[in-house]
Structures are given as C-alpha cells and as structure tokens.
Amino acid sequence: AVCKGAGAGDVLLANRTPAKAQALADELGCACGTNEEVAGICDFIFLGVKPQMMADMLDELTPTLEARAESRPFVLVTMAAGLSMQQIRQMAGSGYPIIRMMPNTPVALGDGMIQYCSDDVEPEKMAEWLTAMAPAGRLDAVPESLIDAASAVSGCGPAWAYQFIEALADGGVAAGLPRAKAQEYAAQMLLGSARMVLETGKHPGELKDAVCSPGGSTIQGVRLLEERAFRGAVTDAVLAAFEKTKDLGKK
C-alpha cells in the first residue's frame, strides 16, 4: 500500500534474488536495483530481512553507509523481529538514526497495524516517514520495550485470525453451508466485529454480552469455548510467540 501510494521515482527495491526484485517492482510500478544502490541513495533504508541474515547484509553495506553518512544523511528502518535498535546499530558499525517498526501482513491492503519506535531521528524526517507510512494502516508509537509484545499480538495475530476464520467456515460447512459462503460469512463477521471494537470504544466483553440472549444459541457456543479453554489457548499462543521473538534477538 505504501509503495502504490508513492511516486514511481520515490521507491527503489532490492532483493538478493534480482528476478524477485524486478517482478515486485513491475507489480508496484517502482524501480529496482542492488542493496548497495539502495544504501547509497535512499533517504529511508528499509531493512526487510530475517534476523539471522541482518548482520551479514549490514556488513556488506557498511562501506556504502560510511561513505555517504556525512554528505547525505539517512535513516535506517528495521523490521526484523527481536533485534533492538542498539543491535542494528552495532551491526551497521555506527549510531545512525534509526526507526524500528513492526508491521503486519494487512498493511498490503492499507488495513495494517504498525508499532514503531525511533532514536536520533530528526522531527522533520520522522514526520516524512509517518506520512509515507500512513497508507499502510494504523500507526502507534510505543517504547522499544513493548515492541516484541506488540508484534506477538498484531504481527503474529493475522495467522490466528485466519485459523479462526477457517475453523468457523469448517463449522458452517459441517452445518450445511457451501464452503465459499461459509468462508465469506466468517471473514465479514470478523471484519465487522473488529470495527465494532475500534469504532465504538466498548469493551469486547460488553459487545459479546450484547450478542448473547438469555438461553439462546450464542451463549451455548460461548460456554463451549470456555470449556475448551479458548481464551487460555489464545493467551498462551501470544506468550509463546512473544518468547520466540525475544529468542530471535539473542541468537
């Protein structure tokens, strides 16, 4: 969503596999180049690699970054789970201005959630970055100490939401609905329910109670989910993801 909202000359893509970079550039209407070219000319350098690959990539880019640091300042933007801003700076070999962000996959449609923190970024550059990111969805500044927890909820959460949609659709099929209809109903229900939470400001428990009529069908489903430890399972999933994210930063 961000790339599609930017001008054709404002985004330069790079990938260790040139064919992938070219295909994505063609899809988004952007230019593509090498990692060194990105490091040499871009104002915001997005580091979109896995944590275990970050050190090697930055080691290759260090000479380019050092050469331009004084004449043309830049901001490093990291999306690597578990790696702190301090770790990224150590890998890059200097205390460059840095933004750490945790997006999720719905940013592709402009309905994502991005938590971010920054260090030593000039206010005008921060404002520029926020404007560029706005088409991706909601943005929220958080202390770096909360980034990993935020990632466990909104970064990993879409996978669990898809599991829930699939499970609801399975139930609908078991009850006689065609698969396509059951999936559509489940997805739209989750979308609308999320909007109810965000736009009404009401507690999810209050909204849940409003659907549960005394002696009705919904409360029976709620009762069964409670018996099967639905809440506990979801909470444990978040904590498991949180612990794994922290482990990534230790390796």
Predicted regions and their residues:
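Conserved S-adenosyl-L-methionine
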Residues: 3-10, 95-97
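N-terminal Rossmann-fold cofactor-binding loop
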Residues: 12-18
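Short acidic-hydrophobic, aromatic-tinged amphipathic segments that line or gate anion-handling sites
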Residues: 31-37, 140-142
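Internal alpha-helical scaffold of NAD(P)-dependent oxidoreductase catalytic cores
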Residues: 87-97, 113-150, 161-199
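NAD(P)-dependent Rossmann-like dehydrogenase/reductase catalytic/cofactor-binding core
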Residues: 187-251
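Rossmann-like NAD(P)(H) cofactor-binding subdomain of soluble oxidoreductases
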Residues: 18, 23, 27-28, 37-114
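Short pre-catalytic strand/loop immediately N-terminal to key active-site residues, enriched for Gly-Thr
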Residues: 98-99, 147-152, 204-209
